Design a protein with these regions (language model features):
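Short gly/ser-rich anion-binding loops that grip negatively charged ligand groups
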Residues: 59, 75-81, 398-405
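Short, surface-exposed, low-complexity cationic segments
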Residues: 46-67
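Segments that shape or occlude catalytic/ligand-binding pockets
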Residues: 2-26
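Active-site loop segments of alpha/beta catalytic cores
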Residues: 1-6, 36, 45, 70-332
Length: 405
């Protein structure tokens, strides 16, 4: 949760963008061109743009009417991507191992994005309200496609990580109400990320968006790293709320990535982000884009410099502790140590430890702690699930005469 040293941006990942499926689906996207993807969506990639974008006009939109989506939407056949895996896997694994990095398989255009690539952004959001049944059918079809895709990718590439894209909001808000996201997209993604986790692969979800209202859902459905965490999400507050359930990768927003950004400005921005976010743990400082590097290379240089400087210093991590119960004299007088023991001790060694501490039975407590260690229990569990439980039961009556560690 609080590594030493702090990871720097994408340095832990070797991203494979040349696997047979990604090459088949996105290989014709070239800067300065207009092309069609395998779903039939027109993709424009202007010379001066940071990335490609879908084009929607009445003539070009693949699915202009979701009530007839089965007539116009044709899922790409990934069975044609059966060749070239061994060469790709061998080359990518060798490169990742040589760099001491994790091999990451890349999956662009997630379930929501695929919907608006086919229909247009406004029509997708409108259809969620006006045609929910048809949208569920389309989403299920895309989900099945993504599950087939990731199965083939894991089988063929054997990656350590799957890096999957799907933007769910702007920098200030979700694209839809949280309950609507839960209704249409939460369960499909639970299946998607659940499958990846079942294969022993790390899950990273890219969304450079404001996602505070659904961050607990993201952790629940199996996302391990949220890449693209914008500063607008209030990262320190999220760290306190999540308590390690989700690693946040981001913090360096697009506002600093400018041609006129000066070294002192970039360093000051990065240092402030590091000082606020790194002590909370489960944080990887990074540009929030969905692939490594900034648009303007000099910005990346100074962001990296700030992280390296941070790592050269001495930092004391923040360790959250459970709240200490208030202690009142009146309650202490009312509290008495139970004299009698129950006829039958609980089979739970942690419960027995809590009871022994609560009753002030020092020898028994020490004996039970040794028993727990002999049974393979972790010291941290003995403390948190046994001793601290007993202390909390004592509450206001807790004192040096009543309990001990």
């Amino acid at each position: 949760g609080q590594p030493e040293p702090q990871l720097c941006q994408y340095e832990a990942l070797h991203m494979c963008l040349t696997d047979p499926i990604n090459t088949y689906l996105r290989g014709n996207r070239k800067r300065g061109t207009v092309s069609k993807d395998r779903w039939g969506t027109t993709i424009s990639f202007p010379e001066d743009a940071p990335g490609p974008i879908p084009v929607h006009t009445p003539e070009l939109t693949v699915c202009p009417d979701v009530t007839h989506w089965k007539d116009t939407v044709h899922v790409p056949d990934l069975s044609v991507c059966s060749e070239g895996w061994e060469e790709c896997r061998t080359r990518s694994r060798a490169a990742a191992d040589a760099e001491g990095k994790l091999l990451a398989g890349f999956m662009g255009t997630g379930i929501f994005e695929q919907c608006h690539f086919l229909m247009g952004f406004e029509d997708t959001l409108t259809a969620l309200y006006e045609h929910p049944d048809e949208m569920r059918e389309l989403i299920e079809t895309i989900t099945q496609y993504r599950l087939d895709y990731v199965r083939r990718l894991i089988d063929g590439l054997q990656p350590d990580v799957i890096f999957s894209h799907d933007d769910w909001g702007t920098k200030n808000a979700l694209f839809m109400k949280p309950d609507m996201w839960r209704e249409f997209f939460k369960e499909p993604y639970r299946r998607f990320y659940g499958y990846i986790r079942s294969r022993g692969v790390i899950t990273i979800h890219h969304a450079d968006s404001y996602l505070v209202p659904i961050v607990d859902d993201m952790a629940e459905i199996g996302i391990q790293v949220w890449q693209g965490t914008l500063p607008e999400n209030d990262i320190p507050a999220l760290q306190r709320h999540l308590s390690g359930k989700l690693t946040l990768m981001g913090g360096f927003g697009a506002a600093i990535d400018r041609a006129d950004a000066q070294p002192d400005e970039i360093l000051a921005y990065a240092r402030d982000t590091l000082a606020r976010c790194c002590p909370g743990g489960h944080f990887i400082p990074s540009i929030t884009y969905g692939l490594a590097s900034t648009v303007f290379p000099h910005v990346d240089q100074y962001l990296d410099q700030a992280v390296n400087e941070y790592n050269a210093g001495l930092h004391i991590p923040v360790t959250p502790l459970p709240a200490v119960p208030k202690r009142k004299i009146s309650a202490a007088k009312a509290e008495v140590v139970q004299a009698a023991t129950s006829a039958q001790e609980s089979a739970d060694v942690f419960e027995n430890i809590a009871r022994a501490l609560e009753r002030g039975q020092q020898k028994k407590l020490l004996s039970l702690c040794q028993q727990a260690l002999d049974e393979g229990c972790r010291p941290s569990d003995i403390l948190s699930r046994g001793m601290i439980v007993g202390m909390n039961r004592l509450g206001e009556a807790f004192s040096a005469n009543r309990a001990f560690v």
